[in-house]
Amino acid sequence: MQKARIKLASTNVRSLEEVANQIKQIAERTGVRMSGPIPLPTKRIRIVTRKSPDGEGSATFDRWELRIHKRLIDIEADERAMRQIMRIRVPEDVTIEIELIS
């Protein structure tokens, strides 16, 4: 049977876990096999900028960081389960990718 690989990514951990739990509940209700959510390494994007706009004065820096959290879910591509997954309300800050694999 075909599998669906669902990749979730977000800067907000709570909304990411919420979507992953909804997918998990759908899998339990429909009785399909599921593995995950597997936490993937968090990508940390760091940007360091000078506080002073003109370059004069003491060298003080602002440090900014953006963390991108990811989860991976493999689920059997059952038609009923996939229809319910497609109808999940996904918050704006969560990116979702669904890929069918054999």
From Swiss-Prot:
It comes from the Archaea. GO terms for biological process: translation. Keywords: Ribonucleoprotein, Ribosomal protein. Coiled coil: none annotated. One of its GO terms (molecular function) is tRNA binding. InterPro entries: Ribosomal_uS10, Ribosomal_uS10_CS, Ribosomal_uS10_dom, Ribosomal_uS10_dom_sf, Ribosomal_uS10_euk/arc. GO terms for cellular component: small ribosomal subunit. Belongs to the universal ribosomal protein uS10 family. Involved in the binding of tRNA to the ribosomes. Part of the 30S ribosomal subunit. This is Small ribosomal subunit protein uS10. The lineage of its organism: Archaea, Methanobacteriati, Methanobacteriota, Thermococci, Thermococcales.
